[in-house]
Amino acid sequence: MFTGSIVALITPMDEKGNVCRASLKKLIDYHVANGTSAIVSVGTTGESATLSHDEHADVVMMTLELADGRIPVIAGTGANATSEAISLTQRFNDSGIAGCLTVTPYYNRPTQEGLFQHFKAIAEHTDLPQILYNVPSRTGCDMLPETVGRLSKIKNIVGIKEATGNLSRVHLIKELVNEDFALLSGDDATAMDFMQLGGHGVISVTTNVAARDMADMCRLAAEGKFDDARIINRRLMPLHHKLFVEPNPVPVKWACKELGLVATDTLRLPMTPITDAGRDIVGSALKHAGLL
């Protein structure tokens, strides 16, 4: 089962917007050293929307190579066309990745039956473990617990990243899935409470810059030491929120650069650099967390 603090890793780039291998290695080494449970490569935070399919696959494979078996790598493989999601997923069938994170189709807003058929078709074309990803604030599409329950009966659909921030979803989904189905928060600000209600971990933006703290918080929560976990979470709470003061991954890329984890905070259009006001806000949150 996928558990603990899983990082939604940024994709570091050089000043020309090309993927920076040296910075990627530095990031991976940082997460290995600080107890991160797994890496999600080229998800939303990894700027999947501005990478070509070939670049997307190249970054995942580079991440897998640089990880060198030290930490599991999960590939982001979502698309809003089922055939495209299948094609992207199949690129990794024999790669050695730990699984795939597949977002609900965005913009075209399928019905619940459409969502079921979409994920069922992907699962039928691969043996890789599949983690569903529900983030309606970005996709315009909300996968309901009943649909998750139906999909959980498919052998290689093994978990969900639930990013609504609606904590009632934990109980509703738990009632419909088996105990081995991984319930992962996709919302850092509510992840601690999500785990207290029975979740197994978080796929996190904050972990990019606070890997040890997030790993410790998740470990303590898993051990039932919620008072201790909450002490860490309280210190990180401004960061959980302020990393979204501008569109993700703009603030977290800047924060990674500020902490010396990457060489630049270069983004690809239509994403633009963090504003001066954004720097002040995120910098203050980093200081509150004890990271600066």
UniProtKB/Swiss-Prot annotation:
Q: Which reaction does it catalyse?
A: L-aspartate 4-semialdehyde + pyruvate = (2S,4S)-4-hydroxy-2,3,4,5-tetrahydrodipicolinate + H2O + H(+)
Q: Which residues bind pyruvate?
A: 45, 203
- Per the record, the domain of life is Bacteria
Check the record and name the InterPro entries matching this protein: Aldolase_TIM, DapA, DapA-like, Schiff_base-form_aldolases_AS, Schiff_base-form_aldolases_CS
Record key words, sorted: Amino-acid biosynthesis, Cytoplasm, Diaminopimelate biosynthesis, Lyase, Lysine biosynthesis, Schiff base
One Gene Ontology molecular-function label: 4-hydroxy-tetrahydrodipicolinate synthase activity
Relate the protein's function as given in its record. Catalyzes the condensation of (S)-aspartate-beta-semialdehyde [(S)-ASA] and pyruvate to 4-hydroxy-tetrahydrodipicolinate (HTPA).
Q: What is this protein called?
A: 4-hydroxy-tetrahydrodipicolinate synthase
Q: Which organism is it from?
A: Cronobacter sakazakii (strain ATCC BAA-894)
